[in-house]
């Protein structure tokens, strides 16, 4: 699923469909942020490693925000996803 496929769900009159769309949108954004944070952490740690076989070092991904703030955002988004998952279980919503 990608963000475009959730547009119709967000416009539904059924709150369960909007709920699913919100969950999937948040999950997509969370996974993208997680990937960025993983790349940032790997680049930070690679500074202490010798160059790879090709003789190059890992480049730091472009980001304008401090890495610790991005990690905090990921953590809070993860908590929010967990809340949505618990609520879905309670309300019988299949994500």
Protein language model regions, located:
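Extended, charge-rich alpha-helical interface modules
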Residues: 1-95
């Amino acid at each position: 699923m990608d963000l475009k496929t959730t547009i119709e769900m967000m416009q539904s009159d059924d709150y369960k469909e909007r709920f699913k769309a919100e969950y999937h949108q948040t999950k997509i954004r969370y996974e993208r942020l997680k990937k960025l944070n993983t790349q940032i952490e790997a680049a930070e740690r690679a500074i202490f490693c010798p160059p790879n076989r090709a003789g190059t070092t890992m480049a730091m991904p472009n980001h304008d925000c401090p890495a610790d703030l991005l990690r905090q955002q990921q953590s809070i988004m993860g908590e929010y996803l967990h809340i949505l998952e618990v609520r879905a279980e309670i309300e019988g919503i299949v994500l």
